[in-house]
């Protein structure tokens, strides 16, 4: 039923057998694969009852982002060991739907630092170990575009971090100075933001200085084999076919077209100033035009499983596909799934490049806004 529709899924890092999903009914459902029932083992109901749109896991802690309700959009932080109520709630970080959440990957140097993005165009770093919202916000940037995805980008060892100069201000008390000089708040590294208009921007998270903004991801068309992007399915710091360390702030994107085709593409800023962006195609996955078992419609989600070296994808055609990057492998069927199809990744015969499509929205199916 509509009231039970789920908006986001994620694994729980502290338990390889558990995963969670956020609901439009305003709760987080937690499942354990070892349980004999298909019912969730836990339901965490948010105090606002607002639909949850995004979720991220950090050990035993879970962060969830809500849809705008009235004038508030909230980030609830849950402790899975005491689930009666969130341990923290931040209601002023964003002023519109919170669409994307991700914790910093370095749990030692930057523990509990949460990156968030929303429809208000803001991209924020928040220290979720601090209860008081005014103290918890580390830095904020404005992309001037409604955001669909944010994340921590890859960067080389030579990356020029924002210099961390100890701050002393006569107007600050000891508490405030201790906060701004917190080592966990410095050298956070670069982040990426992808908008609903299919634009990419790169930022340094310490103060959200812009490295590169307003990059149209549908503009590059000189890929070989030929490929034209319609939308970004998802993004990550590094992809399964990365062959060399990043020379500048970079990230990988899973691109899609209207027919169900996909491509794994990386974008890298050539220097810290981000004047030049280098685009590289690492793989192209066919649609049903070239492979009968591939996707025939828009692809909504992707998940790379490093252990099995498989890429799982789901689309509007109702298919769940398991792809192998080893072209010699036989197709692999996802275990226990229903309505599934399989294929190995192959480079299809080159076909004439299609004319780039006009940007904008299809008013019938909103095909150019896959996150809507």
Language model features with spans:
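Terminal intrinsically disordered, low-complexity extensions flanking WD-repeat/beta-propeller proteins
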Residues: 145-372
């Amino acid at each position: 039923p509509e009231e039970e529709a789920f908006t986001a899924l994620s694994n729980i890092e502290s338990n390889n057998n558990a995963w969670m999903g956020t609901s439009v009914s305003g709760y987080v459902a937690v499942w354990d694969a070892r349980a004999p029932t298909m019912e969730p083992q836990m339901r965490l109901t948010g105090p606002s009852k607002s639909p949850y749109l995004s979720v991220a896991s950090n050990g035993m802690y879970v962060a969830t982002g809500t849809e705008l309700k009235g004038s508030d959009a909230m980030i609830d932080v849950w402790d899975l060991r005491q689930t009666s109520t969130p341990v923290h709630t931040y209601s002023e970080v964003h002023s519109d739907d919170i669409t994307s959440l991700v914790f910093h990957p370095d749990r030692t140097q930057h523990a509990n630092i949460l990156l968030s993005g929303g429809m208000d165009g803001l991209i924020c770093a928040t220290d979720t170990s601090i209860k008081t919202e005014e103290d918890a916000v580390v830095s904020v940037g404005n992309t001037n575009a409604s955001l669909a995805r944010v994340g921590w980008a890859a960067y080389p060892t030579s990356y020029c971090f924002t210099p961390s100069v100890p701050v002393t201000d006569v107007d600050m008390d000891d508490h405030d100075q201790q906060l701004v000089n917190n080592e966990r708040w410095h050298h956070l590294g670069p982040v990426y933001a992808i908008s609903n208009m299919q634009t990419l921007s790169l930022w340094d998270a310490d103060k959200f200085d812009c490295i590169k903004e307003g990059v149209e991801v549908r503009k590059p068309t000189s890929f070989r084999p030929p490929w034209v992007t319609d939308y970004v399915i998802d993004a990550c710091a590094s992809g399964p076919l990365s062959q060399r360390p990043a020379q500048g702030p970079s990230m990988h994107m899973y691109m899609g077209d209207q027919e169900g085709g996909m491509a794994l593409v990386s974008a890298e800023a050539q220097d810290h100033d981000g004047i030049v962006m280098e685009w590289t195609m690492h793989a192209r996955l066919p649609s049903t035009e070239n492979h009968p078992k591939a996707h025939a419609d828009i692809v909504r989600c992707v998940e790379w499983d490093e252990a099995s070296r498989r890429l799982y994808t789901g689309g509007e055609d109702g298919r769940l596909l398991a792809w192998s990057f080893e072209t010699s492998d036989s197709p692999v069927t996802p275990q226990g799934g229903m309505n599934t199809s399989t294929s190995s990744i192959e480079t299809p015969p080159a076909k004439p490049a299609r004319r780039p499509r006009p940007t904008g929205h299809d008013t019938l199916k909103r095909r150019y806004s896959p996150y809507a």
